[in-house]
Amino acid sequence: MKKLLLQLDSSRLPSVFDQVVAYDAGADAIMSYGGVTEGDVRDLIHGCIFTRGPKDLHNTAVWIGGNNMSAGEQLLALAQDTLFAPFSVSIMLDSNGSNTTAVAAVVKIEETVGDLHGRKVLILAGTGPVGQRAAGLLAKDGADVTITSRKPEQGEKARQFIDARFNVGVKSVAMTDPSTLPELLDGVEVLLNSGPAGVQMVPKAAWSGVKTLKVAVDLNAVPPLGIEGVEVDDAAERRGGVTVYGAFGVGNFKTKLHKACVAKLFTRNDLVLDAEAIAEVARGMSKAKR
């Protein structure tokens, strides 16, 4: 029986990237829909669950993507509400690659630092979907997490979302210019940049002298890079006693994780792969390679 993936994309054009990765992960056919709204979800999901017997439904799965994570979360909630036993299929949410990117960064940090309980983490520009999910996962690891934002109200809104979504407690601080970096970096062991492409967030002089710093991860792949001194293809390189990862260093693992998760969707018919479940897949991959 063919493995069928239903791609629900909130953007007008379904992601070609996601389709290519899904085929590489073992999907036999992909049914792609773009511009999917909340009102479309029920009938599309019904088309998945009522066409094969319950014992065969693990061969059908749903992928939710698009450029807007908030829209993706709404589609996921509606898709879950449409399913009922025994008519269920596995679903994965990864709008704009936010879940797999955040998880890949978190697992690389875990590999480097080990136990994160009580360790001080600073996430620059942590108000976007990647920063929020990384913050939530690291806080669930027991880390003392602070996110930064240029606008205090935006940071507070993100903090409230993270705390509610992941049942954790993170902090938010405003970072309007680099002059505040020395104070923000004081005692930090983990530095993660999830800021906008092409914007340098941290000059090398600001982080290279932080004696407590153990790992720095920059998810910006567009020059100028977000953390000066971290190269885009760095993968566990050592710079001044600090282990560093660039966007491609994280991205290579992210793509492998993406494929592994799509493959996992076809192993059973009741999986929901959101940030936490994707993190468990990634941690399993990390352990397997040691």
Describe the residue ranges of each PLM region.
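Rossmann-like adenosine-cofactor binding region
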Residues: 170-245
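Short glycine/serine/threonine-rich phosphate/pyrophosphate-binding segments
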Residues: 102, 128-134, 155, 199-202, ...
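Glycine/charged-rich beta-loop-alpha catalytic/anionic-binding loops adjacent to active sites
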Residues: 84-92, 239-241
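Glycine-rich phosphate/diphosphate-binding loop of Rossmann-like nucleotide-binding domains
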Residues: 111-190
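Adenosine-phosphate binding glycine-rich loop
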Residues: 222-290
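N-terminal ligand-binding/catalytic initiation module
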Residues: 1-86, 277-290
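A glycine-rich, Thr/Ser-enriched phosphate-binding loop motif common to dinucleotide/cofactor-binding enzymes
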Residues: 92-110
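Conserved active-site and cofactor/substrate-binding residues in soluble primary-metabolism enzymes
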Residues: 35-40, 70-74, 100, 104, ...
